[in-house]
Structures are given as C-alpha cells and as structure tokens.
Amino acid sequence: MRVLAIDPGLTRCGIGVIESSNMSMVGVGVLKSSVEDSIELRLMDIDSQIREWITLHNPDVIAIERVFSQQNLRTVMGTAQVAGVALLAAAQSNIKVVMHTPSEVKAA
C-alpha cells in the first residue's frame, strides 16, 4: 500500500510518500506558497502541488495531520484551509483519507 502523508501548512506544507509493503520512503518534500500572494492564490498553488504528487505517486490512501488548537489563530486558520484543500484533492481523486493527530503520528 502506498501512503501519501501531508502535514498541512500555508507557507510550508510537509509531504511524503511511503510504500508500506517494504517500509520504504518513496519521496519527501515541502510544498511552499508565497506570503506575497493572496490567500486564494496560495491555496490554489498548494492544491496544484498536492495534485502533482497524487499524479506522480498514485497513492492508495492519503494521511493528513489533523489540525489542533494553536495559540495563533491566523496560523491555525491557514493550516485548516490547507487541510481542506488536501481533503478536496483526495476526494476528487477518489482516494481514501485518514486523519491523525500530531501525537498519533509521533507515537507511530
């Protein structure tokens, strides 16, 4: 099973692909959007980059880190918006999604 994992973030969004059959890392990267751009352009840019990874790696499932409460409301809003973009890209690609909290990811 091939898993595409996303750690959502508006300025920097972590992304990686693992092959669970042999526990190997297929790819890892950081998706970036420019702070100079408007929010809608930034989200569109992140969406495009996520879709490129989906097309390139053909994952069976997408794992997205669940947004948790942060001190900075602006940061949590951007993170939640990127998570929404990732959920939409997965749904439109007919790929199952699993959501995990940061503590669940660290425990695994």
Regions found by a protein language model. Give the residues of each.
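Phosphate- and other anionic-substrate recognition elements at nucleic-acid/protein interfaces
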Residues: 1-108
